[in-house]
Amino acid sequence: MNHEVSSKNVRKENVNKDNVNILKKSNKIIQALDLPTLCNLNPRSVYNKVDEFHTFVEEESVDLLFMSESWEREHLTLDKIIKLEDHTVISNVSQRKGQGGRPAIIVNHKKYQVQNLTNSVVQIPWGVEAVWCVLTPKNVKHDSVIQKIACCAIYCKPNSNRKTLLLDHISDAFNVLSTKYGRGLHFVLAGDTNDLNLDPILALSPNLQQIVKNWTRMNPPALLDPIITTLAKFYQEPLCLEPLDADPDKNGVKSDHRIVIARAINAINNKCGRKTKQIKVRPFPQSGMEKMKSWFIDKSWEDIYELESAH
């Protein structure tokens, strides 16, 4: 018993330091601690889903939400119906005629300083459905890799005749903000892009990546709700959750778009759901086993025995 205790209590000076592995904390994880939980949501009108929306944001601890089809109304704007104590609503109700569309950004102002850039630093052409803001983490330091995050929520209706105008706008805004803020600026763009070609956006920087991998609408299957960001390496693979349902007391229908959630990497849970694939094999019958046995017995192995080396 005494021998066992003494062997476990090894004196510090007897430890060979050459055999000690020092585990360094990942800088990527440290930097990701300041990143928001992202959500890309197309509610197909949030007005009959307000309670469900509030519950979802609170339960999932969403910090930065991109809403594509809010269907905002001029006489009842989003900031009058969305009542999340810690969140700021950024929208632009005067960006189109008629019902539908009208993207918005809802962001946690307790964690980030929020500056609305819509039609101030970034001018939005008429008919382009986009809103912009820039976030600054409240504990940012002068040497932080992530100084600011420029955010854009977009909506491009199917077969839109303003696709080129939208792409030109995003390119112009990207260049304006990159020049204005410089080092440490990152981008997140999300929304419902339908049949918009995303390649011109991705070509703006080699660091921009589209990180959503699964269908976001199931009938018919399509990936319509991308998240494009320069922060891809700091995020886990996004999850696609069930569409937002209408409030029980409202006369509404469930959205047909799944909700996309992207969480920053951390030291505890960086694994996506288990992926499986089906592998089909042809069974080897007993008759085949007997034939193989006979072949081994009848085979002359002299050429093998005469080899000087297996190599």
PLM regions and their residue ranges:
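Short, Asp-centered acidic motifs that coordinate Mg2+ and/or phosphate
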Residues: 64, 186-188, 226
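Proline-centered loop/turn at the N-terminus of a beta-strand
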Residues: 88, 186-188, 259
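Conserved beta strand-loop-helix elements of the APE1-like EEP
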Residues: 97-116, 135-138, 156, 193, ...
